[in-house]
Amino acid sequence: MLSNNDFIPLATRMRPGCLEEFVGQSHLLGKDKPLFRAIEKGKLHSMILWGPPGSGKTTLAEIIAQKAGARVESISAVLAGVKDIRDVVERAERHKGQATILFVDEVHGFNKSQQDAFLPHVEKGTITLIGATTENPSFQLNNALLSRTRVYVLKQLTEADLLSILENALANEERGLGKKALEIPEPLRRRIVQFADGDARQCLNLLEIIADFALEENGRFVVDDGLIDKVLTEGLRRFDKRGEAFYDQISALHKSVRGSDPDASLYWLSRLLDGGCDPFYVARRVVRMASEDIGNADPRALQLALDAWETFERLGTPEGELAIAQAVVYCACAAKSNAVYKAFNAASREVKSTGSLEVPLYLRNAPTRLMKSLDYGKDYRYAHDESDGFAAGVDYLPESLIGRRYYFPINRGLEIKIKEKLEYYRKLNEQHKTTEDSKN
């Protein structure tokens, strides 16, 4: 016969009710940590709990409220609006003798005006705000709200953490699966934990599904590889297409390419694609890497990156992903230079600081008689008619910027040759200047 407990999800039944049952986050909840001491003493302060799904944000908020003997009002930023916040505040004011905690799940979902609605009530102490978010608060929450709260970063649970949670659920007869006599060999437990990818809720949900499908043999419910294979059909990676993990992984890919590590580059590329990242986005980023971090040290990298982009457009997933992988490996192994990147930034800063300086007359086009009469294009020297294809002594910058340099090629790859050629041209300019000075 089914009990009422059987209709409650295992993850809910096994939710810790006190700090002693809470698994993980020892950097916050160690006995010598400020947050642990504050919770134990029942001291409340507004906070943002930032961490990945299944890391314990909601559970921790409930434990904090229970320890403080506070009323709890819970809303989801995805569904609630300013009116819901006002209703919570009104109820809190009617219960002034008892602290009110407003727990806001997915708090990053509130826009600026909704976030501002909290501020006066947090400042007056009418409510204590505990917001939970999977997104970086510095990007998603306004400064006024952040300045009135403390941000606590919850880490992804380790495999050891999840094993502890799983084994507790298997052993617990009151809230868990202890009465079912479920037998899961150690290697299969680790497969479940690895599949859950740091998410305690996901781990327990998987365990519950496995328990439901397990077949009884002589009074025991045995789990084998076949059952695990059926349940664990598709990985759920720690990834959000526009969340913190997304940008972390893109950053890791870019830095691995820049650091000339093809193996790490392939790993992070695979993580992104496995997590559902748009391959076109990755292809665009690889083009950026080819320009920013390789540049003229190996111009073939840019062409290969563009070819990979086009190849993916033609082939799609999954065949076209190999072309992106090829470009990533080439870029990781190519000679590196950020000289063009730095030069372009320097030139852009110059333009912003100096404004619209005039183009020298001899560099201007003169398609009409009037322009020619105004000396447009006068004394311009056509470089192809000069020795070495270089018009020594000609200045191409505005007069006030003559002599300014932005591009400094380095001693790697093709830029070695570029550097030699530019040094040769500078010597020709110096010789021309010396010759002109001697004439005067």
UniProtKB/Swiss-Prot annotation:
CDD domains: AAA, HLD_clamp_RarA. Gene3D superfamilies: 1.10.8.60, 1.20.272.10, DNA polymerase III clamp loader subunits, C-terminal domain, P-loop containing nucleotide triphosphate hydrolases. GO terms for biological process: DNA synthesis involved in DNA repair; DNA-templated DNA replication. The keyword Cell membrane does not apply. One of its GO terms (molecular function) is enzyme activator activity. Belongs to the AAA ATPase family. RarA/MGS1/WRNIP1 subfamily. This is Replication-associated recombination protein A. It comes from Coxiella burnetii (strain RSA 493 / Nine Mile phase I). The gene is rarA.
